[in-house]
Amino acid sequence: MVSIRPSVRHTPAYVPGEQPQTNDFIKLNTNENPYDPPAQVLAAVAAELPKVRLYPDPVSTQLRQAAADLYGVDLNQVLAGNGSDDILNIVVRTFVDPGETVAFLDLTYSLYETIASVHGAKVQKIATDANFDLTGPVICPEAKLIFLASPNPPKGKHLNREFLWQTCAQAEGVVVIDEAYGDFSDEDHWDFLQEFDNVIISRTLSKSYSLAGMRVGLAIAAPALIEEMDKVRDSYNLDRLAQVLGTAALRNQAEFVPLWEKVRHTRTRLMEQLAELDFQVCPSDANFVFAAPRWMAAADLYQALKEKKILVRYFNHPRITDYLRITVGTDGEIDQLLLAIASLKGSLG
């Protein structure tokens, strides 16, 4: 009988959003950017294709330098990962021994719990209020690591800045501020790095930079933390094409800013029109909207939209079974979504 580690055997697998195998779906379920990367970013791949027989730069120097230049930090403050999920894994493996505590909000990115549990860590869930918000700083002195996403899924609202600051000031261990959706928000936390040597900011190029298929993540922190994380990082953890596309994207950030503004504009329209269609709509600082239909069970609406070839996200979690998470797509995609919802609502009489 093959022996499986108990921490693995007893951990439910992470459930990603559905990836349809055909191209006839409107895909609003995994928070991808609806707009293609600019042409000059995609053009960067051409020169690298003949080099794919060669190993990539094992430490992603050009990508890290582009990030350092953009975010105003030194090269030795940046670690590159195979998506921000890789960064989160590296953080747990670097700073937490099995049996030690990892803390995170009771409603947040569910992969935090999966990674911590598989590692054999204890998990401490921090209670949020009825609006899925923090009620004060996270006080968990036993935690070796605290994950805090801002904006925080599934609601999509950024966390209270003062609560975050107090959390970092009081924490005994490392605090990861996960800014996966940061470019769609008016809040950032770069000044935290100047004040606290226990803070890691996690970023991804999957959302705002339209590179979900490339898997590019970044950790930005004090050099001492990055040095230890680099020991844990897998060798050649970022492929050649991902590095060159990620570098080009960061170097051409100005080309993406109008796309972020389009997402924000469409997000506002989606929130307003869902409210008109009798949804309870949560305010959002991300590229998705979290909303509950008052006239139909969310699970039933999810299935009805899927039958119309529109994918949104439903979570079978006790506190949020009334809600759907809807990625902000193009204006045309959102038009079709809203028409489908209006039709379904109208059919109920």
Swiss-Prot record:
Pathway given in the UniProt record: Amino-acid biosynthesis; L-histidine biosynthesis; L-histidine from 5-phospho-alpha-D-ribose 1-diphosphate: step 7/9
Catalysed reactions listed for this entry: L-histidinol phosphate + 2-oxoglutarate = 3-(imidazol-4-yl)-2-oxopropyl phosphate + L-glutamate
Annotated positions of the N6-(pyridoxal phosphate)lysine modification: K207
Enzyme Commission number(s): 2.6.1.9
GO BP: any one term: L-histidine biosynthetic process
Statement: the UniProt record of this protein carries the keyword Amino-acid biosynthesis: yes
EC top class named in words: transferase
Ranges for region Disordered: 1-22
Cofactor(s) required, per the database record: pyridoxal 5'-phosphate
Top-level division of the source organism's lineage: Bacteria
A Pfam family matched in the record: Aminotran_1_2
CDD domains per the UniProt record, alphabetical: AAT_like (cd00609)
Subunit description: Homodimer.
NCBIfam families (UniProt xref): hisC (TIGR01141)
PANTHER family reported for this sequence: HISTIDINOL-PHOSPHATE AMINOTRANSFERASE (PTHR42885:SF2), HISTIDINOL-PHOSPHATE AMINOTRANSFERASE-RELATED (PTHR42885)
Entry protein name: Histidinol-phosphate aminotransferase
Species of the source: Synechocystis sp. (strain ATCC 27184 / PCC 6803 / Kazusa)
Classification lineage: Bacteria, Bacillati, Cyanobacteriota, Cyanophyceae, Synechococcales
